[in-house]
Amino acid sequence: MSKVTITLEDDVRARKTKNGILIDVPFFVSADVIKAEFKESEEFTIDDIIPDGVEGRRIHWKLSGDKWNALVKAKLAPTWYGKFTCDIHDIKANAFTDKDGNDRIALTATFRPIKSEEGVAIGTTNELEVIDARGASEESTDSAEG
């Protein structure tokens, strides 16, 4: 499994759903994730919660799936934490060049909560942007759309 770093930005919106809390956050992911072959529905487990930082609560977690792992950093409210499993759906990818001429890939994905050991189910709909697009190509973009 490859490892990537995902950084969640501060633009976090949350609302309650029948499964718990739905959190909408944009985040950035390295190009390694593009090389993985995604399935339409894939389970991930988020664990290894480590509080960090002084502004709000910054947490790190490990995102584990069949195809790849990610170390996630997020600044969230103190009660939004715990080990839980999500399905990932609706992955789309678009290649583009940023204002500095760097090749990037924008991804969108929907995470649906399955369970939470801390009693808080969290689902996320995220905007992902590749911040390190080494090795990224139209081919890998197509495979990520899968």
Task: Put a short name on every predicted segment.
Residues 82, 87-137:
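OB-fold/S1-family single-stranded nucleic acid-binding modules
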